[in-house]
A protein has these predicted regions:
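Juxtamembrane helix-loop transition segments at the membrane interface in multi-pass membrane proteins
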Residues: 65-83, 144-164
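Helix-loop-helix hairpins and the membrane-proximal interhelical loops
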Residues: 1-40, 111-128
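Alpha-helical membrane-inserting segments
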Residues: 26-35, 39, 105-113, 117, ...
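Hydrophobic, small-residue-rich transmembrane alpha-helices and their short perimembrane loops
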Residues: 13-101, 134, 169
Length: 175
């Protein structure tokens, strides 16, 4: 494949993104089947219906934030794919702290809304589900962001075009 870093031609972007987006769309359909299979669980615990969609979106958002930062650093020439890259670790720490804060707040918000619209789950249970699964999703988003940026770079693709769709779609599936 030709090196698309530094090029902004529509043809190059479409040629890169079209097959990727088709594959990711097919994978997204699979996640819909998983959600459908869990329908009974969600109907038994309506508060989860409040929690799950937001968690799915938030995992992708966290991955998109890190992917954007990594892509910018790559274009500026300051990104090192090294375990000693202090800026990379600072970005990862920021994402993890943001995840803990957001998923904790999400658990409380789901509990409050659950009290209004349905029979709520216990706050402790919601916090364990929200923060626990949210942090696992955040770790996966971090790993996916770094891997997608690295693979894009090694393949000569512009990570601005590839990383965010890959990370957000995979986080949607894993969420």
């Amino acid at each position: 494949m030709t090196d698309s870093l530094g090029t902004w031609r529509a043809r190059t972007i479409v040629a890169t993104m079209f097959p990727l987006l088709v594959a990711l769309s097919i994978l997204e359909m699979g996640s819909g089947y998983v959600l459908e299979a869990l329908e009974a669980t969600y109907l038994d615990n309506p508060t989860l219906l409040i929690l799950v969609p937001v968690m799915i979106g938030m995992g992708g958002n966290l991955g998109a934030i890190l992917s954007s930062r990594l892509s910018t650093r790559l274009h500026l020439g300051t990104l090192e794919f090294s375990p000693r890259d202090e800026q990379l670790w600072a970005s990862v720490a920021a994402i993890m702290l943001l995840a803990a804060t957001v998923f904790g707040a999400l658990g409380v918000a789901a509990w409050v809304l659950g009290r209004v619209v349905a029979e709520p789950m216990a706050l402790a249970d919601l916090l364990i589900i929200s923060v626990g699964s949210g942090m696992v999703l955040a770790v996966l988003a971090v790993v996916l962001s770094v891997a997608a940026t690295y693979v894009s770079y090694r393949q000569g693709l512009d990570p601005d075009d590839t990383t965010i769709p890959v990370v957000t779609n995979v986080c949607d599936i894993l969420g």
